[in-house]
Amino acid sequence: MNIIFMGTPAYARTILDALVRAGIGVAGVFTQPDKPVGRKQILTPSEVKIYAQQNLPHAKIFQPKTLKEGTVAAEILALKPDFIVVAAYGKILPKSVLDIAPCINLHASILPKYRGASPIQAALLNGEKNTGVTAMLMDEGLDTGDMLGFTHVSCEGKRSAEMFEILGELAGELAVKTLFDFKNLTPQKQDDALATHCKKIQKSDGLVNLSEDAEQIYNKFRAFHEWPGVFLESGLKFLELNLAEGSGAAGEILRIEKDGFVVACGTGALKILALQEAGKKALDAKAYINGKRLVAGNKIS
């Protein structure tokens, strides 16, 4: 079996590794162009490119700005793939590519729920108890293709980084199973009436207000823990928090405990364990409280 793999982040790298370990031949790898990262804007390759360079010496690596470039379809065709496997690639596949071989996407939700760019974060943001991965035959729509298989998993109490790892492993297993069983699978249409969508995450999505429900803020924290984090309009960022018991005026410090402090929200309360003011170093909650000389009854803003 000979495939082309298209993907970019660690989630995709995990899937690619599962395919390689299963003995599936990878003729080519498509990934996003290297991007400037950090304050020094150092040009950095994707996780998938790093993996391919280290483990796939015979695979061609492609980093086109768009798959609509004139030579892309011809280059793919020349590699004679049996399948094109796609996972969090971040680019639209045009019809000229979709027509070359069956294109199978490993989407990190149970479709038709959470079509779009951020399905893992969306599941956590909405307080879902379970999520999963769908293997799907790609078409020209956004995550609208016929489904080939599913894997379900609990996401209760988990954060985005943990779910990316868990779902990457499950997606790798599902990808291998789907390719080897492909001829025996019956594609299943999605019910568009049940479809929900999720968007690309922006930094502004991490903005919270303590007048919100505590559970809503907690779910934002779980979803955006990796990036962009959760922060108040003042720039104060919550680095570690949990749900807590208590009620009071939004932003009021209800009590100070050994390892943190409890603050009231619009409904419910949160225990803050670590935080960071804009432009300053991260602090544990106790150091922050002592430095600001805050006591129960004071407000956080």
Swiss-Prot record:
GO terms for molecular function: methionyl-tRNA formyltransferase activity. (6S)-5,6,7,8-tetrahydrofolate binds at S109, I110, L111, P112. Its EC number is 2.1.2.9. It holds the Pfam family Formyl_trans_C. InterPro entries: Fmt, Formyl_trans_C, Formyl_trans_C_sf, Formyl_transf_N, Formyl_transf_N_sf, Formyl_transferase-like_C_sf, Met-tRNA-FMT_C, Met-tRNA-FMT_N. GO terms for cellular component: cytosol. It is an enzyme of class 2 (transferase). Keywords: Protein biosynthesis, Transferase. It catalyses: L-methionyl-tRNA(fMet) + (6R)-10-formyltetrahydrofolate = N-formyl-L-methionyl-tRNA(fMet) + (6S)-5,6,7,8-tetrahydrofolate + H(+). It comes from the Bacteria. Belongs to the Fmt family. Attaches a formyl group to the free amino group of methionyl-tRNA(fMet). The formyl group appears to play a dual role in the initiator identity of N-formylmethionyl-tRNA by promoting its recognition by IF2 and preventing the misappropriation of this tRNA by the elongation apparatus. This is Methionyl-tRNA formyltransferase. It comes from Campylobacter curvus (strain 525.92).
